[in-house]
Each structure stands twice: as C-alpha cells, then as structure tokens.
Amino acid sequence: MDKEFINGDFLSPIQLLNNQKYDGHKSLHDEEMADSLGFSGAPIEGCTHLSQFVPLLEEIFKDEWFVSGCISVHYKNMVFEGERVKAFAKLPDEESKITDIWMEKEDGTVVLTGSAGIGPNHQTSSLDNLMSKLDKTENLVILSEINEGLEGNERFTVKIGFDQHMGDLYPFTLRNKLSVITEPMTWYNEAEENSSPWGRPIIPIEMISVLTNYVGNPSNFKVKGPVIGLFANQEIKLFKGPLFVNEEYQIEKKIIAVSQSKRVETYWCMTYVYDQNKILVAECLLNQAFLKDSYEGYEEELKSISGSINI
C-alpha cells in the first residue's frame, strides 16, 4: 500500500516571547499573564510551528516551495514549552499543487490543521475556505473602530538582520531564533559556504511572520485596550520568494474581515510585502483574536452598544 502522508519527528519548540510587551503590558506568552486568564501555561507562538513543515514541503514541492510556497493554518490547541509535536503532510497527486497539513502532540491532540501548496496560480487554501463561511458580525466592543476594508494609513519599511533586535513585540534576534529553530537549514545561515541557491541567506518561513508584524499596525487600526491577543489563523503566501536577510521590504496592511465568537473578537489583516522594485513578493494573512475576558469593562460596554442599537 502506498504511503498516504509523510511526517517529521517529534520536536520541542522553544519559547522566545516570555518578555514580549505591547500596549505597555505583557502578553499571553508570559506565564503569569497566561495563568491570570485561565490558561495552563504560556503558549508557544503559533508561527514557530511553521518551520517543522519546511522539510516535508521541500520533499513534496522541491525548491519551488521557497519561491511560490503558501502555508495556511488554523491553530486549534496551544503548545507549551516542553511538549513535543510532529508535523504531517499528505502526499498529493502528481499533478496537484496543494495538499493538507496538520500537527499533533504525542497524545494525539491536534495542534493545527491547514493546507500548503505552490504557485504561480495558487489554489484555494484552507483559510480561503474558512473565510468564505464567516458570518456578518456586529456589536463589537474591542474592535468597534475596525471595519472590513480599512486600509492602513502608513507604509512601513522592514527588514531582518542576524543581530537586529526585533523590538518589544519580538524581543529576540534572528541569530537567537536560528540557535533554537526546530528544523535548522543551511540556507538560513550567515556563513558564506552555507549560502542558498540564491547566493545569500533566506528568511525562515516563521520569521516572515515576524518581518510583517514587528513594527506593529498602522495608527488607524485602533484596538481598545489593554487587551490580550493571540493568533487564531495565519497564512503566508509567496509570489516571488524567497525573502532575504538584510533586505529591505515595504509593507502595507488592510483589514479584509472582522468576526467574533463567544470568547474573542477578531480581525483578519492582510499584509502586502513589496521588494525595492515595488513588486509584490508575498502576502501574509493574520487572524488576530482578542480575548473578551481580558478587556476590563467588556460586558458594560457591550450592554451600552446593544442598548443604543435596540432603541
């Protein structure tokens, strides 16, 4: 019987966000903050898990994965430092350019599900399917000033260097990350003898998330706070990859959807990444969820909004 999927080993991702701060307070990745919100520990940031899929996707899609790859994931269960997780990828038909991916803990708990594929004509991803089912939402409190279609009023210049501290949101350097990355690769390294086929080091897929988020959001993306946020869904799509270390890029952001559940309010932010020739090289979709319980006075404000609408 032919094998239906391939997988990596059980690996233990390392937490680098213990000291993360935003809006003047610590994040969910701090043990004390996580405990105060009822979580069993400070979770590993979701994008950390993306690196474990790279060897599998390189095996399936070859070097084209680094040029036009797309990884699209729905985070289902948190992972805590010390836990081991394994990445899986379904083996697609020979003609297919997209496949299913997932990650599990040692006890079988599913950490994430999603899809991965290559371009240039990207097929419908798992998040495309998820977004098509979103219902219209109203009575938002934390995101009352965030609307679908809202475009950022700023364009940011961003880059990642080996020893560049990425700020309060990501209090570490690329060199720090490479010392603990779950799946090392010589193409990420600074040493000349380890240079990639492109002649210079490439940015790991998980660090593209850092590249597009370390500067924060445009000033007109106004989220009420203090409030605690976390990644719920994420997609990174390359059109002209890979992205390179020490290369400057321009990014623009746009809200393409808002939604909510019983516990969170969320926005879906698309970041467009342009190279120095103003060519679109990547898109990064982040569904950021904000915990209602972490915003003081949430219920009172909700009643006020609901009451004014009912009148």
Spans of model-derived segments:
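HotDog/MaoC-like acyl-thioester-processing domains
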Residues: 1-18, 80-81, 86-151, 240-311
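Hydrophobic beta-strand-centered segment that forms part of the acyl-chain substrate-binding groove
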Residues: 48-98, 206-255, 282-285, 289
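Hot-dog-fold acyl-thioester-processing enzymes
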Residues: 1-67, 121-233, 295-311
